[in-house]
Regions:
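Active-site and donor-binding regions of nucleotide-sugar-utilizing enzymes
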Residues: 1-102
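A nucleotide-sugar donor-handling region in carbohydrate enzymes
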Residues: 3-4, 81-155
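Conserved active-site and cofactor/substrate-binding residues in soluble primary-metabolism enzymes
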Residues: 11, 15, 73, 91, ...
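Short beta-strand segments
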Residues: 35, 57-59, 109, 144, ...
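Phosphate- and divalent-cation-binding pockets in alpha/beta enzyme and binding domains
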Residues: 43, 95, 116, 183-185
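Residues at the starts of beta-strands that form the adenosine-phosphate
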Residues: 54, 105, 172-173
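Short, acidic/turn-prone active-site loops that include or flank metal/cofactor-
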Residues: 60-64, 111, 200-202
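Donor-nucleotide binding loops and adjacent catalytic segments primarily
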Residues: 125-202
Length: 202
């Protein structure tokens, strides 16, 4: 929407801050709701507060407690700046409260990912790979991978893949992966992992 193009998180942050500031200056706004914990979310949150506007964070209070993860840094910054925290559950409320958020600014609204799945369930189509491989509904495992840190820790990832394949037994594993993740997984898979099926994102 803002026309930001980059794979570098710091460049994304800078571009979003610049373009979102321009957007807010051209459009009268009282409050901004930011969603999730991406670099663009953090950038929009910072700009919102610098403009003196009300900031609400949807999916607040989520923590991995691993400060080496870029998203964890984003979460801490966004929640720290927010005037209103919309959380997914009681455990998220507890995190927000432990970090000093006033009870009056924390609202448990549920998990928007689950809400989206329920609301769009009728639009889902049966993945083509099921028919191609003769796989019955409900008789498969889905595997996905998008964390750069996990892809970089190749030995850990390889052990994880081996453990998943062993635990799955004869149950097929369908892995909808983006190109980079697919390349990494392909390099690390055991040669006899014939039931591990990589496909394009669905």
């Amino acid at each position: 929407y803002l026309g930001v193009v980059s794979e570098n998180l710091n460049e994304i942050t800078g571009q979003v801050m610049s373009k979102f500031e321009d957007y807010l200056q051209r459009h009268k706004t009282d409050a901004v709701i930011v969603v999730d914990d991406l670099a663009s979310t953090m950038a929009a949150a910072i700009v919102t507060k610098k403009q003196g506007l009300i900031l609400a964070h949807l999916a607040a209070g989520t923590r991995s407690f691993d400060i080496t993860m870029p998203k964890e840094i984003n979460r801490l910054v966004i929640d720290g700046l927010s005037d209103i925290l919309f959380t997914a559950g009681i455990s998220n409320n507890a995190v927000a409260n432990r970090e000093g958020a006033e009870l009056s600014k924390v609202y448990m609204v549920g998990n928007i990912l689950i809400d989206n799945i329920r609301n769009n369930h009728a639009r889902f189509t049966r993945p083509q790979i099921l028919a191609e491989q003769g796989i019955k509904d409900g008789e498969y495992i889905v595997f996905t991978l998008n964390r750069k840190a996990l892809m970089a820790a190749r030995e850990n990832l390889q052990r994880m893949l081996e453990a998943i394949i062993t635990a799955a037994g004869n149950t097929p594993i369908i892995a909808p992966l983006h190109t980079k993740a697919a390349d990494t997984v392909t390099q690390l898979l055991p040669k006899d992992a014939t039931r591990f099926l990589i496909t394009a994102p669905m």
